Curated annotation (Swiss-Prot):
One GO BP: mismatch repair
Protein's recorded name: DNA mismatch repair protein MutS
Keywords recorded for this protein, A-Z: ATP-binding, DNA damage, DNA repair, DNA-binding, Nucleotide-binding
Statement: the UniProt record of this protein carries the keyword ATP-binding: yes
Lineage, top ranks: Bacteria, Pseudomonadati, Pseudomonadota, Gammaproteobacteria, Enterobacterales
Length: 853
């Protein structure tokens, strides 16, 4: 690409372009030329590939053809959406000078920078999903992490203590754009993430960060926000705020505070747990058959986004949870009345962000007005609900009668998309605007009268008066009658079958009308900007109202789900444990064609670990996951799928369920499994809920069994976590005999000949066998293979009764039951030097060893 080194060799326009491009070398520059945004050189080549648009050439500059690509200005949002979805950023350069008065190229400047993490335009955002900008910082003491949702003003920071916690935060927040320092050491942690942006070190300086944040919030210090003693988080937040100011180039009044997210305030879930529980994304990367897909019937986009935040960050404060439960219970009788009204509120949260950024469009203000119009009915319906939390929400919603009246007077019922299209401000709002419009709108009547008058005066029946954008107003006469045109008609344009003329009176009226249209549009833009000035002083109360409406939507939704899906209200206990009566998996029960088999669960200080055995496909994984999901739902304040639930304190949820090769990192299935297991053993506490499924299956039988046994021992004896431990190693069913707090349960099945029926019912005690061959037959494995497998199984059982499936009192004899002491015969052989023996001594040793066996 050409550079600014040889500017003089270029045309004036290209000189202007290259200077602007030099200020934004790493992102695409949309350069406004008339009705198009043009891209040149490397930008044009990239855009043609990313957007599938034509790559052409524009003349020559500096003696070389200029690669060029362009998009129409009226379709720019569609193209921006495509680029943002691919992680690209775009600088928008507009004409700010007047072409009529400019000498040389029209003055242009970059008015905004669109990046994946800072978009607020409705067309570029997914309405039911948060769009976050994030920054990450690392030093010797740990990590700093900050996130900002510019479409709501929600600003958060945290200080993850280790790599695993940081990875979990990245997965939970899933930022659209991630800023990192140029010397960031842990690139493996963020490689492959979308929207990575390398930033200079000075942007992360702590003093600069404090100064930036205090300036934004209008404060002298950050003590009031509770973040003063979070230096690593502040470093990340400072860089993030600097980046937003650089890209938005406007004030950010909706970003009014910053909140510290502390680990002790919420239930911690690592990346593997979030993935395995399929909270908002299934294992295939989609959204079907997830917890959110069942639970999210919210009627506003902002409510949907809040519900997903709750699901990914369950709270541990029981006061908050009980308040939510009480609100859900109080709202159950009015959900059918509230939801249709709430639906009309729309996405007030994001409309307010665009208002703050002064990018709100006429239809945004119309939607805001429509939201205000719903408030009286919502407040009236909630007035009858006798619940303190509900009344608190009702108060926070506010009324905004004056703002509603203002928008009803100012904006027409169905405004156009853009202010520049005109016709946004309602008649009667401004007297001067009405006068200019009357003058412009009166043109049609005047032209009709002029046409009738001139036809009568000239006697020319083909005469008509018209207008086009190029030549303005004209009088048209057919070619056949054009020789009869009066002498005061001045020819303006010749067509194939007609001539067009102008007369002084029409020219004078044209100037007057065009002036009135221009003045009306200019005044309309001014009045529209003044509306922002009238609305923005109320921004804080409006944001509080939007948050209350979103929370109401979530709670009404949870009330409806509880009633529709037959959920019950869980109770919280100070004592450790989980007691569930007839628990169900919230997702599986919705996709099954037959009734779901509900099952109990009892974990307590005296029964902290359940060893779960049973056939493949018997329901072990479903049983384990449903326990975690019931706990998760309880800790967002929701009702749960069970007959009754009592649940004690939980600080973390871990899952070690299933695995696949991590080819990108060069890790095998077994390595992935062991890494996740190590994380659990290092971080679980006695208040953690741990799900362990098939530990050790990725290696040899003896290695796997040894690891599974040791892990179970560690969890039961040392950590004492609440653990569900599913296994096919039946030797582990001996654990309850060897240590306290461990019990056996199994998933039932019935076998008849070559067929098997899964009962999906949890029973006390260990399973008698795993039914592996029956499941293989069910899967369609050829009969001759199944027959051969049965023969081989009988051989193995006869050769190695201790290691095979020999049934002893409902369990199996343990591979680990062999005494650890070495036998005397083995010890004697180890100490024997066969090379030093005579034939007679060797014979004596044979008899001696025989006697030791």
């Amino acid at each position: 690409m050409s550079t600014i080194d040889n500017l003089d060799a270029h045309t004036p326009m290209m000189q202007q372009y290259l200077k602007l491009k030099a200020q934004h070398p790493e992102i695409l520059l949309f350069y406004r030329m008339g009705d198009f945004y043009e891209l040149f050189y490397d930008d044009a080549r990239r855009a043609s590939q990313l957007l599938d648009i034509s790559l052409t050439k524009r003349g020559a500059s500096a003696g070389e053809p200029i690669p060029m690509a362009g998009i129409p200005h009226h379709a720019v949002e569609n193209y921006l959406a495509k680029l943002v979805n691919q992680g690209e950023s775009v600088a928008i350069c507009e004409q700010i000078g007047d072409p009529a008065t400019s000498k040389g190229p029209v003055e242009r400047k970059v008015v905004r920078i669109v990046t994946p993490g800072t978009i607020s335009d409705e067309a570029l955002l997914q309405e039911r999903q948060d769009n976050l900008l994030a920054a990450i910082w690392q030093d010797s003491k740990g990590y700093g992490y900050a996130t900002l949702d510019i479409s709501s003003g929600r600003f958060r920071l945290s200080e993850p203590v280790d790599r695993e916690t940081m990875a979990a935060e990245l997965q939970r927040t899933n930022p659209a754009e991630l800023l990192y320092a140029e010397d960031f050491a842990e690139m493996a942690l963020i490689d492959g993430r979308r929207g990575l942006r390398r930033r200079p070190l000075w942007e992360f300086e702590i003093d600069t960060a404090r100064q930036q944040l205090n300036l934004q919030f209008g404060t002298r210090d950050l003590i009031g926000f509770g973040v003063e003693n979070a230096p690593r988080g502040l470093c990340a937040a400072g860089c993030l705020l600097q980046y937003v100011k650089d890209t938005q180039r406007t004030s950010l009044p909706h970003i009014r505070s910053i909140t510290m997210e502390r680990q002790q305030d919420s239930i911690i879930m690592d990346a593997a747990t979030r993935r395995n529980l399929e909270i908002t994304q299934n294992l295939a990367g989609g959204v079907d058959n997830t917890l959110a897909s069942v639970l999210d019937c919210t009627v506003t986009p902002m409510g949907s986004r809040m519900l997903k935040r709750w699901l990914h960050m369950p709270v541990r404060d029981t006061k908050t949870l009980i308040e939510r439960q009480q609100t859900i219970g109080a709202l159950q009788d009015v959900t059918s009345e509230l939801q249709p009204v709430l639906r009309q509120v729309g996405d007030l949260e994001r409309i307010l962000a665009r208002l703050a950024l002064r990018t709100a469009r006429p239809r945004d203000l119309a939607r805001m007005r429509h939201a205000f119009q719903q408030l009286p009915e919502l407040r009236a319906q909630l007035e009858t609900v006798t619940s303190a939390p509900v009344q608190n929400l009702r108060e926070k919603m506010g009324e905004f009668t004056e703002l509603r009246d203002l928008l009803e007077r100012a904006i027409i019922d169905a405004p156009p998309v853009l202010v520049r299209d005109g016709g946004v401000i309602a008649p009667g709002y401004n007297e001067e605007l009405d006068e200019w419009r009357a003058l412009a709108d009166g043109a049609t009547d005047y032209l009709d009268r002029l046409e009738i008058r001139e036809r009568e005066r000239t006697g020319l029946d083909t005469l008509k008066v018209g207008f086009n954008a190029v030549h303005g107003y004209y009088i048209q006469i057919s070619r056949g009658q054009s020789h009869l045109a009066p002498i005061n008609y001045v020819r303006r344009q010749t067509l194939k079958n007609a001539e067009r003329y102008i007369i002084p009176e029409l020219k004078e009226y044209e100037d007057k009308v065009l002036t009135s249209k221009g003045k009306a549009l200019a005044l309309e833009k001014q009045l529209y900007d003044e509306l922002f000035d009238l609305l923005l002083p109320h921004l804080a109360e409006l944001q509080q109202s939007a948050n209350a409406l979103a929370e109401l939507d979530v709670l009404v939704n949870l009330a409806e789900r509880a009633y529709t899906l037959n959920y019950t209200c869980p109770t919280f206990s100070d004592k450790p444990g989980i007691r569930i009566t007839e628990g169900r998996h919230p997702v599986v029960e919705q996709v099954l064609n037959e009734p779901f088999i509900a099952n109990p669960l009892n974990l307590s200080p005296q029964r902290r670990m359940l060893i779960i055995t049973g056939p493949n496909m018997g329901g072990k994984s479903t049983y384990m996951r449903q326990t975690a999901l019931i706990a998760l739902l309880a800790y967002i304040g929701s009702y749960v799928p069970a007959q009754s639930v009592e649940i004690g304190p939980i600080d973390r949820i871990f899952t070690r369920v299933g695995a696949a090769d991590d080819l990108a990192s060069g890790r095998s299935t077994f390595m992935v499994e062991m890494t996740e297991t190590a994380n659990i053993l290092h971080n679980a506490t006695e208040n953690s809920l741990v799900l362990m499924d098939e530990i050790g299956r990725g290696t040899s039988t003896y290695d796997g069994l040894s690891l599974a046994w040791a892990c179970a021992e560690n969890l039961a004896n040392k950590i004492k976590a609440l653990t569900l431990f599913a296994t096919h190693y039946f030797e582990l069913t001996q654990l309850p005999e060897k240590m306290e707090g461990v019990a056996n349960v199994h998933l039932d099945a019935l076998e008849h000949g070559d067929t098997i029926a899964f009962m999906h019912s949890v029973q006390d005690g260990a399973a008698s066998k795993s039914y592996g061959l029956a499941v293989a037959a069910l899967a369609g494995v050829p009969k001759e293979v199944i027959k051969r497998a049965r023969q081989k199984l009988r051989e193995l059982e006869s050769l190695s009764p201790n290691a095979a499936a020999t049934q002893v009192d409902g369990t199996q004899m343990s591979l680990l039951s062999v005494a650890e002491e070495t036998s005397p015969a083995v010890e004697a052989l180890e100490n024997l030097d066969p090379d030093s023996l005579t034939p007679r001594q060797a014979l004596e040793w044979i008899y001696r060893l025989k006697s030791l066996v």
